[in-house]
Amino acid sequence: MKEKHQIVIWPVYLDANKARNEGRLTPMSCSVKTPRVMEIFKAAEKLGLHPEHVTGKAHPAAWADKSGYVLVDNIGPKTDLLRRIGTEIIRMRGGKQ
């Protein structure tokens, strides 16, 4: 369950295959193609954000995809956290997407 000091990170927020009006919140330079929840979890863990994986939940715009989301500590603006997580996933995948 989400606490006040946590932010929800849905995979669509970092998905380079989605347009901004489809839910992507990061610039293309910090986005990745089809991000997986476990990639987001591992990137947040490496950044020290104390992630929690919540399964069986679907983003309202993609109600059929119940891959879940990741809760991370709220240590700053959401866009900054998303950019850091996206950049870390790119690094984990081995470079530019």
Swiss-Prot record:
Keyword Secreted: no
InterPro entries linked: Signal_recog_particle_SRP19, SRP19-like_sf, SRP19_arc-type
Keywords, in A-Z order: Cytoplasm, Ribonucleoprotein, RNA-binding, Signal recognition particle
GO MF terms held by the record: 7S RNA binding
One cellular component term from this protein's GO annotations in UniProt: signal recognition particle
Compartmental location: Cytoplasm
Chief place where the protein resides: cytoplasm
A Pfam family assignment: SRP19
GO BP, sorted A to Z: SRP-dependent cotranslational protein targeting to membrane
Family from the record: Belongs to the SRP19 family.
The protein's name: Signal recognition particle 19 kDa protein
Organism: Methanocella arvoryzae (strain DSM 22066 / NBRC 105507 / MRE50)
Protein's gene: srp19
